[in-house]
Design a protein with these regions (language model features):
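Short, Lys/Arg-enriched N-terminal segments with co-localized hydrophobic residues
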Residues: 6-20
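Generic N-terminal amphipathic, Lys/Arg-enriched alpha-helix
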Residues: 21-40
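N-terminal and secondary-structure boundary signal
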Residues: 38-41, 56-63
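Flexible, glycine/charged-enriched surface loops at secondary-structure junctions
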Residues: 42-49, 64-66
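Active-site cofactor/substrate anionic-group-binding motifs, chiefly glycine-
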Residues: 66-119
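Short, surface-exposed connector motifs at secondary-structure boundaries
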Residues: 123-125
């Protein structure tokens, strides 16, 4: 996805550095996230998009929106709050705007779709 950062450092969960910081390759983190999501039944394309967003968000230091959320997403998937089989639908498509019904898909799926649509529209309007 963003492809700018190769690795990031993860602080211990107690928040105290103490010189003990782990360095994880972004590719390994993406693979882990994708595998977890696929084991829950998410199709490869969507699992890859979600893994890319979560991992690279961590790499840029925005941990509040990164991989720390994966366990919560898994809980919501298992509880039925997130539909891993949902196919977001474009319900309004005009020259310079579009509206997507995410249909309870995990947020990164319609977000990536919306970004692609916005880029296409920007190139044609």
């Amino acid at each position: 996805m963003l492809g700018v950062v190769d690795s990031f450092q993860m602080h211990p969960s107690n928040g105290q550095d103490g010189g003990n910081m782990s360095k994880i390759a972004i590719s390994d983190l993406k693979d882990f996230c994708r595998t977890v999501l696929q084991k829950e039944g998410m199709k490869n394309e969507y699992a890859t998009n979600v893994a890319d967003v979560l991992s690279e968000t961590d790499a840029f230091g925005i941990h509040s929106h990164g991989t720390k959320n994966l366990p919560g997403y898994i809980q919501k998937i298992r509880a039925g709050g997130i539909d891993i089989h949902a196919e977001p639908e474009i319900i309004l498509n005009a020259a310079s705007l579009a509206t997507i019904d995410a249909r309870r898909a995990i947020g990164m799926v319609p977000a990536v779709q919306a970004m692609d649509i916005a880029c296409q529209k920007a190139n044609h309007t």
